[in-house]
Amino acid sequence: MFDYQALKDTALKTAPYDYLVLEKFVEPSFFENVASDFPEISGAGSFPPSQLKIQGAFKQLMEALDGPTFREIISEKFNLNLDKYPTMYTVRGRCAPHNGQIHCDSASKIVTVLLYLNDAAWGEDGGRLRVLNSPDSLEDYAEEINPNWGTLLVFRCTKDSWHGHKSFDGVRRVVQMNWVISDDVVKKEQRRHGISAKLKKITSIFKSG
């Protein structure tokens, strides 16, 4: 399912912070099955697995992403022992115009993994995540990542790991997985995302009505 050799061969970039980007990390032959089993998400925002139907090829993908082979490669790349840290993940199916504002991930996160699962060619100007040199402007960036099918972005979470993207409104499928400092963080974040997801569903029902 994953091209582990390509990941091993991908160099870690160290400016403006530690990160790596790899296109086609998910092998193209899995596109149809994973796309078919991608959970149904009607609104924008991050949804924890407890609020979604995780099944089939998508479930297999998540099990591999949280598996020992991927963890070992990322541990070596970032010179970390990730075996002692728990993971958590959320799924996004849509992007709202206000999403993508410049930010760093929280201090409770050690490494962030973003795996994009959109069509092979992203034709939009918005929604392309930028690795930023500073928090001052989206135009001050080191690299722009197209959220094409199977594109992987992994970065070390620091006080300077600024990122964001231009506004986009529409379908934008991405999985975010994090290694975090403790199980308490997992419980807190999953609970927070769960409450947020329920509120989004209620809001969506009222809007459709």
PLM regions: where:
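Fe(II)/2-oxoglutarate oxygenase catalytic core
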Residues: 1-154, 158-209
